[in-house]
Amino acid sequence: MSNSFEILMNQLGMPAEMRQAPALAQANIERVVVHKISKVWEFHFVFSNILPIEIFLELKKGLSEEFSKTGNKAVFEIKARSQEFSNQLLQSYYREAFSEGPCASQGFKSLYQNLQVRAEGNQLFIEGSEAIDKEHFKKNHLPNLAKQLEKFGFPTFNCQVEKNDVLTQEQEEAFHAENEQIVQAANEEALRAMEQLEQMAPPPAEEKPAFDFQAKKAAAKPKLDKAEITPMIEVTTEENRLVFEGVVFDVEQKVTRTGRVLINFKMTDYTSSFSMQKWVKNEEEAQKFDLIKKNSWLRVRGNVEMNNFTRDLTMNVQDLQEVVHYERKDLMPEGERRVEFHAHTNMSTMDALPEVEEIVATAAKWGHKAVAITDHGNVQSFPHGYKAAKKAGIQLIYGMEANIVEDRVPIVYNEVEMDLSEATYVVFDVETTGLSAIYNDLIQVAASKMYKGNVIAEFDEFINPGHPLSAFTTELTGITDDHVKNAKPLEQVLQEFQEFCKDTVLVAHNATFDVGFMNANYERHDLPKISQPVIDTLEFARNLYPEYKRHGLGPLTKRFGVALEHHHMANYDAEATGRLLFIFIKEVAEKHGVTDLARLNIDLISPDSYKKARIKHATIYVKNQVGLKNIFKLVSLSNTKYFEGVPRIPRTVLDAHREGLILGSACSEGEVFDVVVSQGVDAAVEVAKYYDFIEVMPPAIYAPLIAKEQVKDMEELQTIIKSLIEVGDRLGKPVLATGNVHYIEPEEEIYREIIVRSLGQGAMINRTIGHGEHAQPAPLPKAHFRTTNEMLDEFAFLGEELARKLVIENTNALAEIFESVEVVKGDLYTPFIDKAEETVAELTYKKAFEIYGNPLPDIVDLRIEKELTSILGNGFAVIYLASQMLVQRSNERGYLVGSRGSVGSSFVATMIGITEVNPLSPHYVCGQCQYSEFITDGSYGSGFDMPHKDCPNCGHKLSKNGQDIPFETFLGFDGDKVPDIDLNFSGEDQPSAHLDVRDIFGEEYAFRAGTVGTVAAKTAYGFVKGYERDYGKFYRDAEVERLAQGAAGVKRTTGQHPGGIVVIPNYMDVYDFTPVQYPADDVTAEWQTTHFNFHDIDENVLKLDVLGHDDPTMIRKLQDLSGIDPNKIPMDDEGVMALFSGTDVLGVTPEQIGTPTGMLGIPEFGTNFVRGMVDETHPTTFAELLQLSGLSHGTDVWLGNAQDLIKQGIADLSTVIGCRDDIMVYLMHAGLEPKMAFTIMERVRKGLWLKISEEERNGYIEAMKANKVPEWYIESCGKIKYMFPKAHAAAYVMMALRVAYFKVHHPIYYYCAYFSIRAKAFDIKTMGAGLEVIKRRMEEISEKRKNNEASNVEIDLYTTLEIVNEMWERGFKFGKLDLYCSQATEFLIDGDTLIPPFVAMDGLGENVAKQLVRAREEGEFLSKTELRKRGGLSSTLVEKMDEMGILGNMPEDNQLSLFDELF
C-alpha cells in the first residue's frame, strides 16, 4: 500500500489483520477533496479488487468515527483495477447501498433492499414482485442504485427488473390476509364502542334513520392527532403516507378548464420547506379548505412525489387538519414584565428583519407597557412606529443607535515643546494574547531607540504568560510556547523597559492600544504610568496623508518602501514604525512647516479628522418634543455634513444637541464595554459619566466575542457583565438589561444570517476567524425578542434579585421619564405665498370671463364657487398657485406641461393653467361673443365628440370641450382631501423646473422627496442562492422561496422620487417634520432629500410632483420642426381617428406594417396590449379613447370583465366601466344621490366592493337596482381591483392625438421626432438597408422572443424596427451616418430621408457624440489619427465608421502634419 494510505490506516487504528489483507496490498489514495464550508473530506481510493464487505464496513466505520471527533465528515469512493466479483459479494454490497444516500428513501428501500440480484456483464437483474416494476422506480431510483454501486468499485450497471409471478402471488395473499385482520379488528372495535355508547347514552327522544351517511363519513375521516410527524429536512426522495406539520407561507388557487381546483401551497416546519398540492372537485368544494391560508399551522398527510413541472419534490395532500401552534408568551405576572430598550427594525440597513409594527405588536401582545426602537444611524421607522403604537395602545420610546466619534484625535499625548529633529525616540510595539489589558497578557515588548533616524539601542523581551498560547495567537503573531517558556517575569521586563525609555519620546502605531496595555500592567505592578510624550504614528499618517485609504502599518510600509518582514512580531513592527516616523517628521517640516512636537496637535490635525476616527456605538433616546427635534438635527448632520462611510456624530455635535435626549451605553461596540474589557472598571467609570444609563445584554448576545477570541470563555463574559453593573452602581446610574433585538422569533435567525453574509467579507461583521482553510465568519448572536422570563433566565447567574432589578425594575422605571411626543403632525402645513388666495381666485375668474363671458353661465359660476370654497377654505390655494407658477415658467421656456392623476377634475386648475383638461360637462363656447351651450344629459361622453356647430349669435365656429368629470374625484366629496398635483414636464426641462421650486420657495425649504429601497424578492432570492453556494447548503425550491421571503424587505439603500419635491413652510424648519440626508449616501448629490419616506409625511407638507416625460418633449420637437402650434391641433381630426380603425390613412396595408391599425408609435396606444384592445373595440370617438385608456391602465377592468361584456354583446365600448369617474357620473345620471354615487365609486375603484360588509354592499345594490342600473354593471363593479382617473386618461389621450396628427399629416416630422426622443435601441446598418433586410431582422428577433431568448436590447430594437419598417413602407428612407452632417443626438431631415445621429451608432455615447460635433466645428478631420484625438473616439469606433463607409478615403495619418513637423 502507498505511504499515504498506510498513514491513514494508522490514524484510523485499523486492526493489524485487516491492514495485512491482500485486498489492501496495493491500496492508494488517488486524491482528497476538502469542502471547507460544509466540512466534508472526500476520499478517492484505488484498490486492486473490490474490497471484501467486512473490510469495506470497517474502513467506513473508522473514517466516520475519526473525522466526527473534529466536527468533520468523511465520505469516499472506490475504484477497483479489477472488477471481478461473485454474485454473493454483489448481494452484500447491494444491501449496503440502501444504508445511506438517495437509495435510503423509505419507499424504495422497503420494496427493494431484500430482493435477490445477479449480474450478467453490465446488466444488473433485480428479481421481485410486480409491485417493483413501476416506471417511477425505474426512472428515479434505479439510476441512483447504479451510481451507488459504482462508488463501491463495481462497473456501471444498467439495472433491469425481473418480475417473479410466485413472489407477486405471495405478496398479494399476504396483503389480503393482513387487510382482513385490519378490517376484522376495526369491526370488533366499532362494536365494542357501540355497546359502550348504548350503555352511556339516554333513550332517543325521536326516531332517526337507521343509517346516518354524514356520521359515517365523519367517522371514516382519518385523524392525524397521533400520526408520527416527519421533519421535512429528512425527506430527500419520494415516499408515501408521510405526515408533515408546519406553517403555510404561500397559497395559490387555480381553476382548471374542467372546473377542478388545484390548491398549491407551501409549508415550512423550520427544518426545511415543502410544496404541497391539493386537488378538489370545484370552487364550492375548495371553500371547505379555507383553512389553507398564510400563517395557518397545519398537519398534512400525503405522498411525496417528484413534480414533473417544477422538477422538485411535492406532497400530494390527502388529509389535513389545522393545529394549534405554541406561541411564545411572557409568563411573568402583569406588572412584572420588562421593557425592551434596544430593538432594531428592518430600517437598520442590511442588519435587522422586523417591521416596527411587528415589534410594537409583539410587545403589546406580551403585556409590555413600552418598547424602544434603536436603528443604526437613522430614525426612518419613527412614523410607522408612531402610528402602530397609537393603534396598539402602547408607549413607544423613540431612539437610535448612533456612531459617535471624537472630533479631534490627538497625534501626540502628553505633549511638550521639543524640536522633533533633536528628540530621542523609543519606537515600541507590544504583542499580546488578546485585546484586553485586564483579561489578556503581554507576551512581547520590543523597541528601537532612535536618534536622527538611526537605531542607537534595541529592546526585545518575551514574557511568559503562565499558560499555553492559543493557536490563534501563535498564528497571528508567530510567537510560540517555545519563545516564552524561559522568558523573564513580567514585572522585571516592565522595570527594564521603563529604564530603557527614560528621557525619550515614545512612539507607537495605534498608540492608544499599546500605551493602554502598558499602563494597565504598570499599574498592576505599582509602577508609574507613562507620563512622557507619546506620538501615535497611525494618527500622524492619517492627518499627514488624508488622501490614502489605508493607514495600517502594512500598507504604509509598502507605500514608502520600508521593510516589514514579520508583521505582528513586535521587534519587526517597532523598527518599521521607526523608519516611518522619520519619513513623517521630514514631510511635516517640508510641507507644513511644523518642527516642534507641541505644534503637531495644533497645526496638523485636520478639521475632518473625525472621518478616520474610531466609531463607538451609543443609544440615543427622545425624552420629549425638544429631544425629537434635536435627534432629527443629529440624524441630518450625521447623514450630510459628517457622513463618511456611515453616519457619524462628533461628540461636540452631540453635546450641542443633547437637550431632551437620554444616552445609553449600547452594545459591545460601545465605549463603556470596550474600556471595561480593555482597561478595567476604574477607567470605565470615568467614561461612563457621559451616559445616562448602562446597558448589559444577555451572555448569548456577547457570545461571538468568545469565538473571536476577544473573550476567553463564558465565565469571563459573565465577569465582564458584572463589571458593567459595578460601573453603574459606582456612579449611581441605572443598569438596564437590553436584548439588542434584530428579529422576533428564534427561528428567524437564518434570515438575518443570509442578509448579513450577503455583504461579503468586506463587512466588519463578516470578518473571518482564523486563517487559511479554517477561516470562517464569526457566528452571529442569538438576537431574538426575548420575553421577561427568557431574559431572567439569561441573567440567572447574577442571582434572582439582581436579575429582576436589571430586567424588570430598572427598565420600567426608566420608561416612566419619557414624555409623549408627536412624531407625525396632525395637520397640513403649506408654505406661505403672499396673497395666494386672492391670486388663485383672480386668475380663475379672469380666465373664465375671457372664455365664457361676464356674467358667467350658472353652471360655470357654481362650479368655480364650489371649488374655490374648498380650495381657499382648506388652505390649498398655495398648492394651486405653486403649481401654476411652475407650469407658467415651463410654458415660457417653450414647453407644454401635461397633467397626471386627478388634477384635471378641478376646473379651477384648468382656468389657472395647471391642466388643459376641462372637467365641465360637454359644451360649446364661442371665442368671439362667449355664447355657450352645455349638454348635461350624458348623451356625450366628451365635448370633442359633438358635431361642429356655428354660433347662433355671431356665426363664428364654436369651440367644443368638456369631459364631464366631477370635482369630488380630486379633493373628495367634502373637498378637504389634500390635493396631489402631478405634472409631466418635458424631460429636457425637468431640471429647470426643479430649480424653479427652489427659486420660488428658497433652497432651505425645498427638498427632494426621499425613498427607502428595501431588498426586493428577486434580490433576496439571489442572496439565498449565494448563501447556499458559499456555505455548502442544499435547499429545495420551496425552502429557497421561504428563506427569500424572510430576507426580503430589509432596508438596503435610500433614494429619491423621480420628480417629487417636498416644500417646507417658510415659517417653520425642516426638522419640525423630518431629518434630511443625501440620496443613496451620495454626499456629492445636488439635492438633499427627506430622511423619511415622503409618503410618511405627505399629509403634513406640500409635495410637488415635477415629473419628466417624453410627450412634452415630442410635442416641442414637432413644433420646432413644423412651426405648428400644438394647442391649435383639433381633437376630432378625421384622419387621426381613422388610425384606430385601419391603415388606409397611412397609405399602407396591414400586411405591409404587420398590424391592422395605425397605432404603432402612438403614445398610450402603441403597445401590443392596447393595440389588441383597439382591434377588438374599434373606437371612433374621443370618449371611447378615454375608455380604452382607463381600461388599459386599470386592474381587472378589461380582462375578465369589460372584454367579456363586449364580446358577448351585453355592452359596448362606450357603456362599459372604463374610468373611475364614469361610475359616479353614470350613477348620478341614473338617479342616485351624489353622495352615494361617490361612495360607490370609491369602494369600486379601490377594489373594496367585495371586502365591505354584505349589509353595506346590499344597500348600494338595492339603490342601483331601484334606479334601473343593469345587473351586468353591478357585477362588473365587483370584479374591479383598481381604476384609472378620467382626468389622467384625458390628458394622456390629448397628448397622444397631437402626436398622431403629425404621423398622419406630417409624417417625416413625426418619424424624426420619434427616433430622436422615443426610440431606445438602434441598428443603423439594418435601418438603412431597405425593407427586405429590416423584415428579416424583425423575423429573427420575433423567433427569439417566442423561445424567450431575446435580450432586452433586442426587444427594444424590435419596437424601433416596427416604426422603421412602417416609415420605409410609406416611402421614406434612412441615410447613412455622415461625419459632417449627422447631429450628436437627434435625427436630421434631408428631403424624404432621415440622417441618423452619432448616438445611434452602437457603443458611441452622448458625451462622445457631442465632443465629436464640437471638434468637427473646429475644422475638417484630415486623418483617422486626428479623428481619434480631436473627436475623442476609440480605435474600435473609428474602425466601425470606416467599415460603414462613413470616413471615405480618410488616411490613417496626417502626412501634411508630419511634413510640417519635419520642417
Curated annotation (Swiss-Prot):
Function: Required for replicative DNA synthesis. This DNA polymerase also exhibits 3' to 5' exonuclease activity.
Top-tier EC class: transferase
E.C. code: 2.7.7.7
Protein name: DNA polymerase III PolC-type
Gene3D superfamilies for the chain: 1.10.150.870, 3.30.1900.20, 6.10.140.1510, Metal-dependent hydrolases, Nucleic acid-binding proteins, PolC, middle finger domain, Ribonuclease H-like superfamily/Ribonuclease H
Entry annotated with the keyword Zinc: no
GO biological process: DNA-templated DNA replication
Source organism of the structure: Streptococcus pneumoniae serotype 4 (strain ATCC BAA-334 / TIGR4)
Similarity annotation: Belongs to the DNA polymerase type-C family. PolC subfamily.
Reaction it catalyzes: DNA(n) + a 2'-deoxyribonucleoside 5'-triphosphate = DNA(n+1) + diphosphate
Hydrolase among keywords: yes
PANTHER family (alphabetical): DNA POLYMERASE III POLC-TYPE (PTHR32294:SF5), DNA POLYMERASE III SUBUNIT ALPHA (PTHR32294)
Gene designation: polC
Protein's cellular compartments: Cytoplasm
Annotated ranges, domain Exonuclease: 425-581
Any GO molecular function: DNA-directed DNA polymerase activity
Entry's Gene Ontology cellular component terms: cytoplasm
Keywords in alphabetical order: Cytoplasm, DNA replication, DNA-directed DNA polymerase, Exonuclease, Hydrolase, Nuclease, Nucleotidyltransferase, Transferase
